[in-house]
């Protein structure tokens, strides 16, 4: 690949453009132009340089303009200052300049030409053959493989052991290790019987160089993992026992079930030996050999490496001492320094500034961005990993199958050898018969049921029948004259219908699991019920259990179970006496407290008959016999006096024979004794455990407790706890009052007997019984019992709040707030329902009232209006207009009832008018502002807050239309006006000035009645 040189020659423009040129690194994404030789300019025959080099020299010499596609010398900028490279460039530049000055200066000396021609970049000469190669590489056992590609392993997988021996290690191996180790005498056997797989021969074999490197490599890896900061104090290195224990543990803990998972330090051992060990363990096959290994037929080969536990056992200690000496000498660092690479987790500047990093990257590190394509890429990587796992599983299963086949062939070969030897021995002895044992029998072939073929045959038969039927129908249709077209059309329709039915049947069979059969093909079977199926299932289970019990009984025949753990152990639940300071009042509400309260003892159950036999120790056990030592006769067994001594603690121990919790509970239920729920189960068990706990010393329990506290007015109080206990029995006997004692107390009072017989209520302050009860009530609130004793008396507390350690005051507040919130919710729901019902009733009434008003207005327009009583009506109208701003106006005497309510929102008005047919001979104007805005608001707070007032107004509205006197005085009508109060939803009064909507003002008095004149 070459690039055209620049065509320009010198100039200011060229220098300016050259200064603006910016070099870019070669990118893989951008294409590069490739020129052929014919595209390049012709060169002189004496010039041996490439066009790109000539262009580079021209640009450097004359500072000409660089071409965009100009290529450098192929060397980095920081490496262009290398000595040999500069010499070659300078020599080439001299040659180029000499050829440009009219074919060079012919006066140049021959010596300069020779020196320029001798300048070159030194490279190793690979054309020669090394004669001493056979001296150092004398490995004749290596065989060149047919193909070099054997498996897709990386370089790290085939690199082998990372530790390499040097001269010091080689001297130690030859002078010390080979002479003194292994310390096992080699077996004196013939060379013909020498076998490499023999354990004794493995122990006698010397340590090879590869094995020495493996041991040192393991020590290096383990010490790097366990002591990463060993360079701080090299003398504090781990001992050989600790390191060998870590190495052997890692060797034994290979995960066979999950071969893809490599945890911990297993990732560091990527080598051929590690792969062989892992695969040999997974396949349980040794030795694991690859195609790159040497031939196993070569006895001198050192390829067979013993496992690391064996190497540590034979050569571990001396190799460890040698390695430790070199490790301390290196001050805790690696014995052989390794190359330093870029740290991907470190900062890019740190990697760039570190001078010891080799093999730096030339491309830029791209910044990671979270994009949507990352999820797709991750999913594809997961699928690829799954497919690789499947491929690996397939390969491993194939390997296991081949190993099983190999084992089968080896066993067949061994059987054949044994048969041949037995046949020869049979011939020598002269035994005849049993010849069928000396030849392999033919194995029966497994006949597979070919269901698919049968299905195919049945489908073919059905198709043939269908085709015959169609052909017969076609023949019958064509034989009839004049019906050929009709027959063909019918056949085509039938075919289409059959095809559609066939397709629908196929679709239904693919979607539904059930097939609908015609009644003729349904088999005659009885209906199987669920109860019958369950009954058969239970019977089979019972039969299986009985069969197992029968077999077990036959096995245990003539045996008596006197073991410590029989088949059906006996459970005894008692109160736990170990935990005395625990809170036991919330046992029914907490499983944790119940586990600490009850103590379960498992014992064995010994029948009374067996107990008597063991206690007597005279009679032999029934059904047990022994063999006599003299003649082997079977005689009845002698008694076992020592057996009763062994089980004596089980028989006499009252702790195991005490009444259990379940037995006590059942007896209480039978006797209707439910005092244990109030008094506690501990009182019943307390008497049983008194004898057992009498001898036990209670060192941890204090005698009593005192507490000093300061009360009001700086008074000191001393509270005692545990000083005295309530005498329950004495107080209970003392509190048992007879009728005579009560009567005696009553006689002492200054009350007549007649009043006593009438009232039968004694005076509280004079009654002796009440005084004693009040005295006893003090013990209930001032008790010296401990929490454990309280728990024994009343373990089943009636207060569930004690489970969460909540005080009584807090619990009462919580309970009251809960009831209040619940009642508030119920009240709110009921009020809401009541409001909806009232609003619905108001809607119905307004609709009815509108209908009545329309009828009355139609009747009023037809009748004439009289002007006799206009003067009296004007006074009443003025009074109405003066008080209409308050929201409601009722005129009961004049027969007019007008109720107007303004909404708080100011948008709607609910008004109910119940008018008479005639008002003083006049008619009502239908264009009143209250009537024009006559609507029903469902969210009206006026209706919600005044349901009672509304019902009262409705009572007044239901006045029947009767004739009233037209000469009623205006003062009397004004005196009958009643203004109702209005409230908002918060209960506060609403002033008429705050109401929005239409109002009655004195200015529009002329609009109240159609025939009312203005009053001046």
Swiss-Prot record:
A Pfam family found in this protein is: EPL1
Question: Any one Gene Ontology biological process term?
Answer: DNA repair
Main location group: nucleus
Q: Where is this region: Disordered?
A: 1-50, 96-119, 450-488, 499-518, 842-1016
**Which branch of life, at top level?**
Eukaryota
Low complexity: compositionally biased ranges: 842-883, 904-923, 960-971
Q: Where in the cell is it found?
A: Nucleus
Could you list this entry's UniProt keywords, alphabetically sorted.
Cell cycle, DNA damage, DNA repair, Nucleus, Transcription, Transcription regulation
List where Basic and acidic residues composition bias occurs: 103-116, 457-473
Q: Where is the composition biased (Polar residues)?
A: 35-50, 475-488, 884-902, 928-956, 976-994
Give start-end of the signal peptide.
Answer: none
Residues in coiled coil: none
Q: Which InterPro entries does its entry note? A: Enhancer_polycomb, Enhancer_polycomb-like_N
Q: Tell me which GO cellular component terms the UniProt record holds.
A: NuA4 histone acetyltransferase complex; nucleus
Q: Which family does it belong to?
A: Belongs to the enhancer of polycomb family.
- Quaternary structure and interacting proteins, as annotated: Component of the NuA4 histone acetyltransferase complex.
Cited function = Component of the NuA4 histone acetyltransferase complex which is involved in transcriptional activation of selected genes principally by acetylation of nucleosomal histone H4 and H2A. The NuA4 complex is also involved in DNA repair. Involved in gene silencing by neighboring heterochromatin, blockage of the silencing spreading along the chromosome, and required for cell cycle progression through G2/M.
This one is known as Enhancer of polycomb-like protein 1
Look up and give the organism this protein is from. Debaryomyces hansenii (strain ATCC 36239 / CBS 767 / BCRC 21394 / JCM 1990 / NBRC 0083 / IGC 2968)
